Curated annotation (Swiss-Prot):
It comes from Homo sapiens (Human). The modification N6-acetyllysine is found at residue 814. Its main location: nucleus. The modification N-acetylmethionine is found at residue 1. The gene is ZC3H18. This is Zinc finger CCCH domain-containing protein 18.
């Protein structure tokens, strides 16, 4: 104990009497054996009692809790109480030694702050318990036992006593020790209550087990020597281990088969730490090799564990071998039913279910702790396994055995029930599966019949479509013939007519329409888009007044989507109207050709009308009365009024009118167009998505193609048809303009969305296009007919690719398309439009400022491309070749997404297109050839796709 270690005490000082506690149990027992020196017993006893009370407290506290805080807090209390106890126990006789005792106590309290406090505390709380419970005569024995216990604890647990045990034992005479014990007895007899209070310390603390269960768990407690002798009066309350009785930790519920007889019969072997006979047994007994209470306990546990592991292994093997092991494993382990039957043991059930599943060896080994082992044994003691019980061959250690047997029976019953249920379930499952299989077979038969019918219908439809396509193609050809005269650029268009690519240039518009006619054919089977139907009507209407055509087309496209309505009208004007969705493109192409002005006004209005209106307004800044986006398309169709033309000019076309001047044919066209172009512009301005087309349209009214290509950009839907119509602008516009492409591919609504989504971008792009058109239109106006469309096509590709990346949603489809278009168109553009490309380069920056942030992003792309004239030229040159593939892709991906993606691009591309028109008709032939090839390829691809889609549609 700390007491012995206190610096003030010399081995021989009166405090030495306290040391016996520090001494080993053997020494204490030896001394206790003889009652020889009674002289000074009172003093020694008093001191010893003080020390015992302190020592017991510390020992207990070590066992229970070495909480320094509690001890320190109670320090003063402990000192006072110890002093009181000492005084009372000493009585008047011990007064001379009180000073020493007090000093010793002060030292002890300082040294034993932790230990003494709990002792004193519990003394106060339980002072009376000892007297009531223990008779006076046994009390001395108990006290001695306690003292020895304290010593034993100190020896076992602390090891502090070890140095003291032998050395101090030698120092102290046996007589002193004996006198200590005699004094103890005397004092107990004299002052039983008080001394008992001191003793009660230990006992109450033992009862205090409840207070400090955690510490007791953690620290092994010394075995109770008195229990080993059979003398322990504390019974279950004893704070030392009674091997079979209270050594189970907190779980006294689980009774262990104790290595030691519960009655206090002689221990299996001499207790290692506690001498067999504290009263006078030979020291040799104490020294005898200990059968430690816990080691025997451990051995018993080990035995039990080993047995349990074996049983578990067997059980697991059997379970694994059972055919329905998996089912049982999942269904039988812990069913809801089982829990209902045995709710008390729910936890155990869970354990049972878990343990068998896991590797048992690993599971059981971790629980060397008796508590866990017991629990686990208990868990798998119950019939965890369906086919066998886990039982010990050993005598049942549990008192709960009968209950467990009942539980097992219940579990077995439950398992049987579960098995029956499982069998029923399996039967039901099989029946259901059979029924399902039959149903599947029936469904397959039905599907086969339906497929056969569908095939037959498809064949019939294909035949009908072919007839329709032929009619449409004829109509288109007729319409193409008309658009040529319409456009002041007829020569170029006529030159291009043989080549659908040529249609891209203003003169080529007719060819573009022819080009679109094949597209129409491919799409005509897919009237679902509504494009195929409207195109034929659009052609007829083209033949009729442009306004009527635009109106009809606009109505059709509007049916598809508000944005398309405008584009549809413009398409109807140009052959490209073959696709109502493309009509915006074709209308632009038409506008390039004689019908160009008309289609322009309408086309711009429709494509812009849907979504672009918000962006348009920025474009409208020039005072164009922009019709509301929804109304813009129709209004533009209705009001291709010349008044809008001026606004258009003012808007994007402020520059456009100037470009108009450069080319007389352009000017004438522009003059023709102004009525329509203004509406178009207006519509474009009115509708955000249309705005792109309106920009290019208004700016290059003369170069109306480029503008319309911009609008076509807004009406990306028409892009595929326009691309097929070979208006280069239309092609790229289709790619660029979400509306046209969307309408061609998907119903107007998708286009409208895309137009709206991209209208902002398109507006920026279109503004740029307008600027470009204004810059490029002068050259374009010079050669609007022949070069206009082809140039626009290449230009559109250029713009389209920049726009494509921005149009993230559809970028994948359109980017590809645009890229192809860019190459072909850019090549053409370079050849024709290097000057116009340069012009464009300057415009894009201006356009960029005008463009909204979305526009800005597109402008950056377009601007970057425009900024580098060479790339634009390259695009212009390449745009033709790529244009066809782009058109194909557009058609292939008719979804409005791709069209909307392209939307931003078309405006940009259209500007290069304008430049390309400018570059001259010289390159138009080569471009036409390239474009024709591309368009044919695109047509083929589109036809294939349509062939696939029509069946789907």
């Amino acid at each position: 104990m700390d007491v012995a270690e206190s610096p003030e005490r010399d081995p021989h000082s009166p405090e030495d009497e306290e040391q016996p506690q520090g001494l080993s149990d053997d020494d204490i027992l030896r001394d206790s054996g003889s009652d020889q020196d009674l002289d000074g017993a009172g003093v020694r006893a008093s001191d010893l009692e003080d020390e015992e009370s302190a020592a017991r407290g510390p020992s207990q506290e070590e066992e229970d809790n070495h909480s320094d805080e509690e001890d320190r807090a109670s320090e003063p209390k402990s000192q006072d109480q110890d002093s009181e106890v000492n005084e009372l126990s000493r009585g008047p006789t011990s007064s001379p030694c009180e000073e020493e005792g007090d000093e010793g106590e002060e030292d002890r309290t300082s040294d034993l702050r932790d230990e003494a406090s709990s002792v004193t505390r519990e003394l106060d709380e339980h002072e009376l318990d000892y007297d009531e419970e223990v008779p006076e005569e046994p009390a001395p024995a108990v006290q001695e036992d306690e003292a020895e216990k304290a010593g034993a604890e100190d020896d076992e647990e602390k090891g502090e006593g070890t140095p003291r045990e032998e050395g101090k034992a030698g120092v102290q005479s046996v007589g002193e020790k004996e006198s200590l014990e005699a004094a103890k007895e005397k004092k107990k007899e004299d002052d039983d209550g008080e001394i008992d209070d001191g003793e009660i310390d230990d006992d109450d603390l033992e009862e205090g087990e409840v207070k400090d269960p955690s510490d007791r768990k953690v620290r092994p407690r010394p075995t109770c020597r008195f229990f080993m002798k059979g003398n322990c009066t504390w019974g279950m309350n004893c704070r030392f281990i009674h091997p079979g009785v209270n050594d189970k930790g907190n779980y006294s519920l689980i009774t262990k088969a104790d290595p030691f007889p519960p009655n206090g019969a002689p221990p299996l072997g001499p207790h290692p730490l506690m001498p067999a006979n504290p009263w006078g047994g030979p020291v040799v007994d104490e020294i005898l090799p200990p059968p430690p209470p816990e080691p025997p306990t451990e051995s018993a546990w080990e035995r039990g564990l080993r047995h349990a592991k074996e049983v578990l292994k067997k059980a697991t093997i059997r379970k694994e071998q059972e055919p329905d092991f998996e089912e049982k494993r999942f269904t039988v382990t812990i069913g809801e039913d089982e829990r209902e039957f045995d709710k008390e043991n729910e936890v155990f059930r869970d354990w049972n279910s878990r343990i068998p599943r896991d590797v048992r060896d690993t599971v059981l080994e971790p629980y060397a702790d008796p508590y866990y082992d017991y629990e686990i044994e208990r868990f798998w003691r119950g019939g965890q396994y369906e086919n066998f019980r886990v039982q010990y061959t050993e005598t049942e250690p549990y008192h709960n055995y009968r209950e467990r047997e009942r539980e097992r029976e219940r579990e077995n019953r439950q398992r049987e029930r579960e098995r029956e249920r499982e069998r029923d379930r399996e039967r039901e499952r099989r029946q259901r599966e059979r029924e399902r299989e039959r149903e599947r077979e029936r469904d397959k038969e039905r599907q086969r019949r339906k497929e056969e019918w569908e095939r037959e219908r498809a064949k019939r439809d294909e035949k009908d479509r072919q007839h329709r396509d032929r009619d449409r193609e004829k109509e288109r050809e007729k319409e193409k013939g008309k658009p040529k005269p319409r456009s002041p650029q007829p020569p170029s268009r006529q030159a291009e007519p043989p080549k659908k690519e040529a249609a891209t240039t203003g003169p080529q518009v007719k060819r573009a329409d022819e080009w679109k006619d094949p597209w129409r054919r491919s799409k005509s089977p897919k009237k679902k888009l509504g494009v195929s139907v409207s195109p034929s009507r659009a052609r007829r209407r083209r033949k009729t007044s442009a306004s009527s055509a635009s109106a009809s087309n606009s109505s059709r496209s509007s049916s598809r989507s508000s944005s398309y309505s405008g584009s549809g009208s413009s398409r109807s004007r140009s052959r490209s109207s073959s696709y109502s969705s493309y009509s915006s493109r074709s209308s632009r192409h038409s506008s390039f050709s004689g019908s160009r002005s008309r289609s322009r006004s309408f086309s711009s209005s429709p494509s812009p009308s849907p979504t672009p209106s918000p962006h348009r307004p920025s474009i409208r800044t020039k005072g164009e009365p922009a019709p509301p986006p929804g109304k813009a398309g129709e209004k533009s169709v209705k009001k291709p009024a010349p008044p809008p033309a001026p606004p258009q000019a003012t808007k994007t076309t402020a520059p456009v009118p100037e470009p108009t001047k450069p080319g007389d044919p352009r000017e004438a066209r522009r003059k023709e167009r102004p009525a329509r172009t203004p509406p178009r512009r207006r519509t474009l301005s009115g509708s955000g998505s249309g705005s792109g087309s309106s920009y290019s349209g208004s700016s290059s009214r003369s170069r109306s193609l480029s503008v319309s290509s911009v609008s076509s950009v807004s009406s990306a839907t028409s892009s595929s048809s326009s691309a097929h119509s070979v208006d280069s602008e239309d092609m790229y516009a289709d790619l660029a303009s979400p509306v046209s492409s969307a309408s061609s591919r998907s119903p107007a609504p998708a286009q409208t969305r895309k137009e709206k989504g991209k209208s902002k971008k398109e507006d920026g792009v279109k503004e740029e296009k307008r600027k470009r058109d204004s810059s490029t239109q002068p050259p374009k106006s010079a050669k609007p007919p022949a070069g206009g469309k082809s140039s626009q096509q290449p230009s559109t590709p250029q713009q389209a690719p920049p726009g494509q990346p921005q149009q993230g949603t559809f970028v994948a489809h359109k980017e590809i398309k645009l890229t192809l278009l860019n190459k072909a168109a850019d090549k053409g553009s370079r050849k024709r439009y290097e000057p116009s490309d340069k012009d464009r380069q300057s415009p894009p920056p201006a356009k960029r400022p005008n463009t909204s942030p979305d526009r800005g992003s597109r402008d950056r792309k377009s601007g970057g491309r425009l900024g580098s004239p060479k790339p634009e030229r390259q695009r212009g040159q390449n745009s033709k070749a790529p244009a066809a593939p782009a058109d194909r892709k557009r058609q292939l991906s008719p979804q409005s997404k791709s069209s909307s993606k392209v939307t931003s691009v078309p405006g940009k591309a259209s500007d290069p297109g304008a430049a390309s028109t400018k570059s001259g008709k010289a390159s138009t032939l080569s471009r036409r050839e390239e474009l024709l090839k591309q368009l044919k390829a695109v047509e083929d691809a589109i036809a294939r796709k349509r062939a696939k889609i029509p069946g789907k549609a």
